[in-house]
């Protein structure tokens, strides 16, 4: 891979996450956003290294104060606050999902890989809400997972539909060629 791709691909991924994170609807301690849609799409289309670097760069940009987190949030406190579990587990989501998918993956494989990654983000979210916000596990599940099951399933279905034609269009580009 060309050296420029090593830097450009994660930067594009981080920018996509930052833009879609701004589409945010506050519905309690955890807002509804499209950042996990961006991460799922990146994880499905990018290789594991670039997918994880995209999320890592996104987290770094937010930590140093750029308003890239949901609703324009920024600062290191977001990485140790109530929603930190979700943010940190986005690294797991991107790496795992990217490792399980490739340009030959079908709808079901893409769906299941993203479902697994998203589920792990929920686990991280519950852990963060419990330990960092002092919320009982049951309440963390009720406010941090249940309201998002249907919307996230819809996002994963959209990722599964969008990524196949996207991968087909990109497969002749240097980075995406097998």
Locations of regions flagged by a protein language model:
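Membrane-helix interface segments
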Residues: 2-6, 48-53, 103-109, 136-137
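Alpha-helical membrane-inserting segments
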Residues: 16, 20, 24, 42, ...
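Membrane-embedded alpha-helical hairpins and interfacial helices in multi-pass inner-membrane proteins
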Residues: 72, 106-178
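Helix-boundary and loop/linker segments of multi-pass membrane transporters
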Residues: 1-3, 29-30, 70-71, 102-103, ...
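Hydrophobic alpha-helical transmembrane segments
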Residues: 7-12, 37-41, 51-57, 79, ...
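Interfacial aromatic-anchored transmembrane helix boundaries in multi-pass membrane proteins
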Residues: 21-34, 59-93
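Hydrophobic transmembrane alpha-helices
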Residues: 1-50
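Short helix-perturbing small/polar motifs within transmembrane alpha-helices
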Residues: 12, 19, 76-123
